[in-house]
Regions:
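Conserved N-terminal beta-strand and adjoining loop/helix that marks the start
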Residues: 1-16, 36
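Conserved Nudix-box catalytic region and its N-terminal flanking loop in Nudix hydrolases
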Residues: 14-53, 57
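HhH-family (HhH-GPD) DNA N-glycosylase catalytic core used in base-excision repair
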Residues: 52, 58, 62, 127
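Active-site-adjacent beta-strand/loop module that shapes the phosphate/pyrophosphate-binding cleft
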Residues: 58, 66-90, 99, 103, ...
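Generic C-terminal helix-cap and adjacent flexible tail
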Residues: 123-129
């Protein structure tokens, strides 16, 4: 299986959601931004690298969320609660919009299926922050 990592970036009681532009099958849907872990790379290093590449900011992994979610027959998603440690997130080539969503607004966007199982725990995290 190929590990994909997603960043649940939290700031001021809100979660950052990113709307995909590619591929066509996922364009217009929302996700926790991130990407694939390269050979020889740790999951944490991959997440920090992917967020810098995709959003132009730096994050710090606070803790990994429980569970892994299958994406397809080849990829599996792990997600981490992250905080911003530098810069301001900006959409890059993979995303056309970013939104900060409070716990009562998490259902306002059309999340990709692998991200959905993480939402109840993230809602609880936001309510406690």
């Amino acid at each position: 299986m190929v590990l994909v990592v997603g960043a649940a970036i939290v700031r001021d009681g809100a979660l950052l959601a990113a709307r995909r532009t590619t591929p066509a099958a996922t364009a217009g849907r929302w996700e926790l931004p991130g990407g694939k872990v390269d050979a020889g790379e740790t999951a944490e290093a991959a997440l920090v690298r992917e967020i810098a590449e995709e959003l132009g900011c730096q994050v710090r992994v606070e803790r990994w969320l429980e569970g892994e979610q299958p994406i397809d027959g080849v990829h599996v998603l792990r997600a981490a609660h992250c905080s911003l440690s530098g810069g301001e997130p900006r959409p890059g080539s993979d995303h056309d919009e970013l939104r900060w969503l409070g716990p009562d607004r998490l259902d306002e966007v059309d999340w990709l299926e692998p991200d959905r199982p993480f939402l109840p725990g993230l809602r609880a995290l936001l309510l406690g922050s």
